[in-house]
Amino acid sequence: DGTFARHSEDDDLPGDGLLTGIGTIDGRKVAFTANDYTVKAGSLGQMGVEKVIRIQERAMDLNVPMLRLVDSTGARLNAEEREPGDTHMDRYTGGKMFYNQCIHSGQVPQIGVLYGPDIAGSAYIPVFCDYLIMVEDISGMTIASPRIVRAMTGEDVSGMQELGGPHLHARHSGTADVLLPDEETAADRVRDVLRRIPQNYSERPPTVPAAPPSRNPQAPHQVIPAAPTKAYDAHAPIDRLVYPASPPRLPPAIPPPP
């Protein structure tokens, strides 16, 4: 959608730096957006924002999952991007993207993959996703870049990984659901997630043949303490209620500190 947006003779802004469309992954229809970092560092321009809004509306019409492949430095701030006093991130354009993500919530699944940096207003996109994958060493998500932090506060940070890298979001902010070693593994995880979830809120999730739980299902009360303030291992009751073929648990992306 919008392949020829911002097309020019010198082809400065092909597709306005954003690909959108509808395709299939293992037979499942999915709507997607993908930033093109080779065009203005994946920044969001006027036409790019319009393309996002259109594909979001199409996903809602079709009731299909929304896949966000993010590699962006945020909103494009060039003077030529707007009229005097106007902005493409207001409530009817850029703000509409986030409104649509709120409307999607609970209706169609939203899966995000950070294949690179995600800075400023664009950093809200993955936060709204239901399931967020970050990739070791290349993902990053911050409201302000290291350069802006240095300019505004005088504080030096070594780079995106220190300021908003995957380790920070997996261990401290809790924004990342899983941290994976490379882009190929991230793509495989997207396929696995799609296999295990329904297309939308009105469909039942995929089913598999039932099997007994790995532990005695008759005794969950034996592993849950009577005192509501006492901590316990949550895996113990789960093992007594859920059979092994159920969706895998989300392992801790980063081991907890000692």
Predicted feature residues:
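Gly-rich Lys/Arg/Thr-decorated short loops/hinges at beta-loop-alpha junctions or inter-strand turns
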Residues: 1, 30-39, 77-80, 150, ...
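A structural preference for short, pocket-lining loop segments at secondary-structure junctions
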Residues: 23-36, 51-81, 258
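Glycine-rich anion/phosphate-binding loops
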Residues: 12-16, 40-57
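Terminal amphipathic helices with adjacent charged low-complexity linkers/tails
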Residues: 178-235
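Flexible beta-alpha connector loops of hexameric P-loop NTPases
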Residues: 38-47, 80-88
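Conserved catalytic cores of soluble enzyme domains
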Residues: 70-202
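Short alpha-helical segments and helix-capping/turn motifs at coil-helix boundaries
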Residues: 7, 16-18, 51-55, 97, ...
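Non-catalytic terminal/interface segments that mediate subunit docking, oligomerization
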Residues: 2-31, 60, 226-258
